[in-house]
Amino acid sequence: RGRVDSSLEILLKIKNTKDYLVRPDKWWKERSIIARSLIYKKKYETAYRIASKHALEEGPEFAEAEWMSGWIALSFLNDPILAKSHFLNFYQNVGYPISLSRGAYWLGRTYEKLGKKEESIKWYKEGSLYLTTYYGQLSHMKVYPNENFELNNLMEVDKKIAENFYKKDLVKLIYLLDELNKDKYSKHILRYLANENKLKGSEILAAKLATDISRYDFAIQVSKIASYEKRFHNKFNYPIINVPK
């Protein structure tokens, strides 16, 4: 801590190869700290060098390193061409809505700076698909600056499918566990039911069942897992509950 110069000396001298570093993911934590310290000192080119020479190839640290490298390139070096490759690497190596919207938004910013309006709008629209995230909302404001946004309506489950769902023995078991105050054991059953037929609404039915027995936490879990695969059940992911008495 506080030894930026001595740390920098080490980071600039060592070989930036995976074989040499052995665990470049462990080195990244220090690189991140030093890079941010250098930004504070307005040493932007050195900060970019430290961030981008990470020797990572995959994993969350790789994604984080690529985003930071792109951010420094775009925001401080004013080099959108350099930033573009980093943001693309980030976007292609993440899967959660919060990260996908982040990558899409910054790609939109990058193409905007390059003067490529169509590409910029394309990425902002991609980011705006994730309206429950910060960058999703920023993306929406870029594409539709004067329009309010609404979360997508919940898909409607076929009435016959819903009727058959509630006839299942496992569903009856969930209600029984609730009556016996043993609803904590229903978590994995609900997860199983949610995975039965996702395209036909099994996740929605499982989340509703969890809500029926006041296990909003289980409903959120089902909905959040679905959101990782770009199926958004916002009614259950962000429930409105009564104030406890």
Enumerate the language-model features and the residues they cover:
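Cell-wall glycan-active module
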Residues: 1-245
